Regions:
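N-terminal juxtadomain amphipathic helix
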Residues: 1-72
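A C-terminal cap/extension of S-adenosyl-L-methionine-dependent methyltransferases
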Residues: 2-5, 20-26, 247-309
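A SAM-dependent methyltransferase catalytic signature shared across enzymes that methylate proteins
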Residues: 8-16, 229-248
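Short aromatic-enriched loop/helix-cap "lid" or pocket-rim segments at secondary-structure transitions
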Residues: 20-21, 29-30, 141-142, 163, ...
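Short catalytic/ligand-binding loop motif for oxyanion handling, primarily in non-cytosolic enzymes
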Residues: 44-46, 114-116, 204-207, 251-257
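Short glycine/proline- and charge-enriched loop/turn segments
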Residues: 72-75, 210-219, 259-267
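Conserved SAM-binding loop and adjacent beta-strand
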Residues: 74-89
Length: 309
């Protein structure tokens, strides 16, 4: 375990234990502690697992890696939902950047790279994805053969890459050193490069409702829990210029609510998810009216757009 004595965002030594939560979406029931910085309100896992030990929490049974197939006979419906999400993310890029054939989209923490495949199809540009392992694509290489997929960390990216758009769809909360990664990305960026970050929002109604069962903890994979205040501080310290901060994202906030309910229920996450599908759909219908309020008060997600210059 790695103990941290200074806030990773502001450097303060004034820390306090905030909450203890059990492992989520995993077969063990290990208890972990999250600290909170008294200066900038940043919440982070402390102590945290060593990187090599954390890898066991990203097995091939990890639900995001299993994707739509985890839902058995309902696979088609879930895959359509993923396609819809990917297209929302493609649109988010089109809204902030003009791209051509030689343009490069770099997705950090790409997991199963369906988003990059959608970018190829809709934007007709070059796509690069990087993750710390290849579990998200190793069994479907033919589906993603036109995408430049790499195993490694941000620090492993070449200095001459120069992406036009960098995306972090629920990656930054997993990063062991977010300031170092953001600074590294800034160094390889062009003046026109755009950065899109989507993360769970600590200052959200779902976190307040579910407390230790909030799926945003994603214990122990999520090392950082950001609020608008400290993620803006993080970006400024990394020399990125913040353009916009939204209290919502492309991901449906209902997913956080549903996963939180499943944590309360104590389901086995590596099982066939068929039996949960009907309840998932009914819950989504009941949740729909709350979405009208997410632009005023975060339900669980936030998005930050930043410029290199």
């Amino acid at each position: 375990m790695i103990k941290i004595n200074n806030c990773p965002v502001c450097g303060s030594t004034s820390l306090r234990s905030y909450i203890k939560t059990n492992s989520q979406m995993h077969h063990d029931d290990r208890l972990f502690n999250f600290d909170k910085c008294n200066k900038c309100d940043f919440v982070f896992l402390n102590p945290r697992l060593k990187f090599e030990d954390l890898k066991s929490y990203y097995s091939s049974n990890y639900l995001p890696y299993r994707g739509a197939k985890a839902w058995g006979k309902f696979e088609w419906f879930v895959s359509q939902s993923q396609k819809k999400l990917d297209l929302k993310r493609v649109k988010a890029i089109k809204d902030i950047q003009s791209l051509g054939r030689e343009s490069v989209i770099l997705d950090i923490g790409c997991g199963k790279p369906t988003f990059l495949k959608a970018c190829q199809q809709k934007l007709n540009c070059k796509t690069i994805g990087i993750d710390f392992n290849d579990a998200g694509w190793r069994n479907q290489l033919n589906s993603f053969k036109k995408i430049d997929l790499r195993v490694g960390e941000v620090k492993d990216l070449p200095a001459d890459l120069h992406p036009d758009v960098i995306t972090m769809w629920h990656y930054l909360e997993h990063d062991y050193n977010p300031i170092r990664s953001l600074k590294s990305l800034k160094k390889i960026s062009k003046p026109s490069t755009k950065l899109i970050i989507e993360v769970p929002n600590f200052n959200s109604s779902s976190r307040k409702k579910y407390a230790k069962n909030w799926a945003g903890w994603h214990t122990p994979r999520h090392l950082s829990l950001f609020s608008p205040k400290n993620i803006q501080l993080l970006l400024k310290k990394s020399r990125w210029n913040i353009s916009k901060v939204f209290t919502y994202g492309t991901m449906d906030p209902y997913l956080l609510y549903w996963m939180s309910e499943m944590e309360k229920k104590g389901i086995e996450w590596d099982k066939n998810m068929e039996e949960e599908f009907i309840g998932f759909v009914f819950g989504m219908i009941k949740f729909f009216p709350f979405k009208f309020y997410e632009k005023k008060s975060s339900l669980g997600i936030m998005t930050i757009i930043a410029n290199s210059k």
